[in-house]
Amino acid sequence: MTTPLALGLSGIRRSCLNTVMAAGLLVFTACGGGEPALETPSPETTADVAPVIIPIEGLEKTDLTFGFIKLTDMAPLAIAYEKGYFEEEGLFVTLEPQANWKVLLDRVIDGELDGAHMLAGQPLAATIGYGTEAHIVTPFSMDLNGNGITVSNEVWEEMKPGIPKMDDGRPVHPIGAEYLKPVIEKYTEEGKPFNMGMVFPVSTHNYELRYWLAAGGVHPGFYSPDDVSGQIQAEALLSVTPPPQMPATLEAGTIYGYCVGEPWNQQAVFKGIGVPVITDYEIWKDNPEKVFGITAEFAEENPKTTKALTRALIRAAMWLDENENANRPEAVEILSRSEYVGADYEVIANSMTGTFEYEKGDKRPVPDFNVFFRYNATYPYYSDAVWYLSQMRRWGQISETQTDEWYDEVARRVYRPDIYLDAARSLVDDGLASEADFPWDTDGYRPPQTEFLDDVTFDGRAPNAYIDSLTIGLKSGEIVSGGEVTN
């Protein structure tokens, strides 16, 4: 059972908002514990006054509850609340942390949550009926990058001798899984299954961990319709562990490594129990991460509310990245609060402010480890959806070959750039964003992407050719049956 945070708007703040909605051109001079004082601005002061935001008329639903998991990439939700962006859009929001990704998805489907911070694979998997079936859509991508892969100290010590060193003795990065492969083989020979953690079967973390392992010659296993463990033919055995539990599970020896979002890789460094060996930025530069998910029914029944919440989230993402991340220290302070991520300020800052610490003391600049708005991070690209679907097919979650057209059709059912651009256009019209901030002319597909760890090119318009180009994984016409891959 989840406990709602004390994040609903107070009566005073709601009263202030109602005054704005009614007054239009009036400007607040106070809006605190006492009565709000209002005065008409003089011509000399209007140039310095921020635009007054008039909420969209006729919002279908204004009292909303959104869910999240305690990870730093939930930041757009926290900032939209703390900076008053939801409020200014006429939305009275409560934020609730969820126990795990399954609970979060189920509560959105059941209507207990109006929307949530989601794994990008969740709306896609639900819509095609892998796991819980429901039509989920996303009008907003929450971020790029933000994950890492950590191994235990013991595993790191066995990997380390084979890794090339720089002149100062530190390891050369990125570190591929080929340096982990002999360790896995040794453990297997000793009768110790090499267990690793990821956060959910359709998570970016699962696919990134699998991508890294496969690029290094380690088989991460297949799924099949009658075996959803994902461990068919696996050399490394991947299983689900909720993000906040990753460090403790590693420390207990239940797993030897994991892939997770922050701050749970940096937590392992601070606790002295593990070493992050690679970030997802190094696996796939500027990869899409989380999305904001709502049911298709919610979007259809509440189009104005959906536009308003998308506006608020875009504004939050802009704030997080503006002035070369100048607001990140404040964002870290907000996220460190118990009602959000609840980790120490220093742990969150270690990755959120443009650095990343690998081995203890080996802190390196990674300015784009977390990206919330730059590089069109918030635009829901169809090609991002296609990549996730390609990985579901690669590992057998999509059991049979599908046409390239099928991938495009699913992407268009789930990813809603039309909603996003409508919200963005209104922000530009209101003077809250610049025309140049948004990709107005895109067809929803990024150009072919080349910056992967294994130098394979991904073209979202040709998913089957991409899948067939990958060394380990299912190819066209192949299925997994009875623990074997057949044509």
Language model features: what each stretch is:
Residues 71, 98-102, 117, 200-203, ...:
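Soluble non-cytosolic domains of exported or imported proteins
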Residues 32-35:
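Bacterial signal peptide processing site
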Residues 39-239, 251-286:
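Short, glycine-/small- and polar/acidic-enriched structural segments
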Residues 149-150, 291-294, 298-299:
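Short glycine- and hydrophobic/aromatic-rich loop-to-beta-strand nucleating segment
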Residues 386-487:
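Conserved C-terminal helix/tail region of periplasmic/extracytoplasmic solute-binding proteins
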Residues 2-20:
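Bacterial N-terminal signal peptides that target proteins for export
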Residues 27-30:
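C-terminal motif of bacterial Sec signal peptides marking the signal peptidase cleavage site
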Residues 300-418:
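Secondary-structure end/capping motifs
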